[in-house]
Swiss-Prot record:
PROSITE patterns: AA_TRNA_LIGASE_II
Record localization: Cytoplasm
EC numbers, comma separated: 6.1.1.15
Gene3D superfamilies xrefs: Anticodon-binding domain (3.40.50.800), Bira Bifunctional Protein, Domain 2 (3.30.930.10), YbaK/aminoacyl-tRNA synthetase-associated domain (3.90.960.10)
Catalytic activity: tRNA(Pro) + L-proline + ATP = L-prolyl-tRNA(Pro) + AMP + diphosphate
Entry-linked Pfam families: HGTP_anticodon, tRNA-synt_2b, tRNA_edit
Single GO MF descriptor: aminoacyl-tRNA deacylase activity
Protein name, entry field: Proline--tRNA ligase
GO cellular component, as recorded: cytosol
Biological source species: Bordetella petrii (strain ATCC BAA-461 / DSM 12804 / CCUG 43448)
Main location: cytoplasm
Presence of the UniProt keyword Mitochondrion in the record: no
Family statement drawn from the similarity comment of this UniProt entry: Belongs to the class-II aminoacyl-tRNA synthetase family. ProS type 1 subfamily.
Length: 576
């Protein structure tokens, strides 16, 4: 490819709305252009990156025995109603009507469609196992699309779905896809971590996320540097306390805490460590229509509530945060001074493990500008109704596998594998005949990769103040040749074209910048775009028999013999 016949349109400034590096740099590099909120056109450079990602994913899916098909973007509401997700999925599911007033959705995922295919296509155990996949456009009506390709409304995903006769076979399919994902992300050239994760709205009994490591990631990844343990913070279990609760040493006392509505303020005012305070979080459920049950969840003041864990407790599925009116009615006080002692109306109390082990703690007195000091379980209030793991783990907690201490880093989710079991086959009655001729439910797994999101995540992990630094495997071009004096020096032109042709003949994805731009402008543009390797061909260097070779990640260029430039470029590429 020659730059003079390619579409390159870089920008000096990023859009004001761009909050993260990938959004800024992809826009400035001319890779994407915004059409509407969360909806982008992939310009030629951006599309090249997407196609390279797709090619790697497709190759590994094929190698793992998955079979490609293509399911529609528009899906009938009946399938979603049959699975129960028409009501469950929420506002992110874009519902539309056709001219006959029939309901459809723009697919955010394809479990319903693939299960419908399976129940019509798979009849016998002899057809199993099977694994279908497709790479298709998705749409999720995000409330606040942001971060460019990181959280768009329209995007491209690879979805795979496995079908097996029993759980053992389904586990083998899951493991095979897990291994394929490991190979995919290794080939993409990204630093990543596979972590155990919650199954969320997809459902199922087991799942792993594949997270690209990046400081801007929205997810917190918990891992043990001394073992293989790794989990999303949503799933990471906090350690059970083995030590016995200390004996009470203080009397219960109501102390004034004017204006101290947060645990940190109370601790500072009373001159106590934050971990001596109690944090009160009020939730509500509706076990019956029109009947509200209020819950008080108690955490240590320095800990944060894990909503995923809370939602899995008996009676708390589908909880919401209580309204201020509900809080005042049950506690006789506005938020900021709430506690478990002397509530106005009965509430169900759930204590985190650490809280159940506390003595002489500080909690709200259910009276504005007052807290209790020296509170103790069993003496000043009943033992908690339920003790559970409610909190997010913190750095330095003992690892659940007992092999060390936990560390935490940020990540961007780009892939997810789920062991579904019979969740969808049961809902949609997808069965096959086993060896005895009896119908049995298909065992399923589903496996997603965010194709377009990978592009954004790769940039979040690989960029500097000058622009993008693409991993070689997904760079729009592997090599750019930058002639200095293209329009003035025939030798420069000839040597540049010679190297260009030689690299193309060896299968290298190379672009020749034949636009005769000034060197500084040319170099800055290609650094912004992020091509991994640049070869500079200039009159002065050729007079000395050399050209310059510089990797995008390196700060200085190396002079290499012009006569062996091809071999040196190929050798350098192998190191990237």
């Amino acid at each position: 490819m020659r730059a003079s016949t390619y579409h390159l349109n870089t920008l000096k400034e990023a859009p004001a709305e761009a909050e993260v590096a990938s959004h800024r740099l992809m826009t400035r590099a001319g890779m994407i252009r915004k059409l509407a909120g969360g909806i982008y056109t992939y310009m030629p450079l951006g599309l090249k990156v997407i196609r390279k990602i797709e090619a790697i994913v497709r190759a590994e899916m094929d190698a793992a025995g998955a079979i490609e098909l293509l399911m529609p973007v528009v899906q009938p509401a009946e399938l979603w109603q049959e699975s129960g997700r028409w009501e469950q999925y929420g506002a992110e599911l874009l519902r539309i009507k056709d001219r006959h007033q029939r309901d459809f959705v723009l697919q955010p995922t394809s479990e319903e469609v693939i299960t419908d295919i399976a129940r019509n296509e798979i009849h016998s155990y002899r057809q199993l196992p099977l694994n279908f996949y497709h790479i298709q456009t998705k749409f999720r009506d995000e409330r606040r699309p942001r971060f460019g390709l990181m959280r768009g409304r329209e995007f491209t995903m690879k979805d795979a779905y496995s079908f097996d006769r029993d759980e053992a076979g389904a586990q083998q399919s899951y493991d095979k896809m897990y291994d394929a994902y490991m190979r995919i992300f290794e080939r993409l050239g990204l630093q990543f971590r596979a972590v155990a994760a919650d199954t969320g709205s997809i459902g199922g009994s087991r799942s792993h996320e594949f997270q690209v490591i990046a400081d801007t990631g929205e997810d917190l990844l918990v891992y043990n540097p001394d073992s293989q343990y790794a989990a999303n913070i949503e799933l990471a279990e906090a350690p059970a306390l083995l030590a016995e609760r200390a004996a009470a040493t203080q009397p219960l006392e109501a102390v004034p805490t004017p204006g101290a509505a947060k645990c940190a303020d109370v601790a500072k005012l009373l001159g106590l460590p934050l971990e001596r305070t109690l944090k009160s979080i009020v939730l509500a459920t509706e076990p019956e229509p029109g009947k509200v049950q209020v819950w008080l969840l108690l955490l240590r003041g320095d800990h944060e509530l894990n909503e995923i864990k809370a939602g899995k407790l008996p009676g708390l599925a589908g909880f919401r945060f209580a309204t201020e009116d509900e809080i005042v009615a049950h506690f006789g006080c506005k938020p900021g001074y709430l506690g478990p002692i002397g509530t106005a109306l009965p509430v169900r109390v759930v204590a985190d493990r650490t809280v159940a082990n506390m003595a002489d703690f500080v909690c709200g007195a259910n009276r504005e500008d007052f807290h209790y000091q020296g509170a103790n379980w069993g003496r000043d209030l009943p033992e908690p109704e339920l003790v559970a793991d409610l909190r997010n783990v913190v750095e330095g907690d003992p690892a659940p596998d007992g092999a060390g201490r936990l560390a935490i880093q940020r990540g961007i989710e780009v892939g997810h594998v789920f062991f579904l079991g019979t969740k969808y086959s049961e809902a949609l009655k997808a069965t096959f005949l086993d060896e005895t001729g009896k119908p049995a439910l298909l065992q399923m797994g589903c496996y997603g990769i965010g194709i377009t999101r990978i592009a954004g995540a790769a940039i979040e992990q690989n960029h500097d103040e000058r622009g993008i630094i693409w991993p070689r495997a997904i760079a729009p071009f592997e090599v750019v040749i930058c002639p200095v004096g293209w329009g003035k020096n025939e030798t420069v032109r000839n040597e540049s074209v010679k190297l260009y042709d030689a690299l193309r003949a060896r299968g290298v994805d190379v672009i020749l910048d034949d636009r005769d731009a000034r060197p500084g402008v040319m170099f800055a543009e290609w650094e912004l775009i992020g091509v991994p390797l640049r070869v500079t061909v200039g009159e002065r260097g050729l007079n000395d028999g050399v050209v310059e070779l510089q990797a995008r990640r390196e700060s200085t260029a190396a002079k290499i013999p012009a006569g062996s430039a091809l071999e040196q470029v190929l050798a350098k590429l192998e190191t990237l």
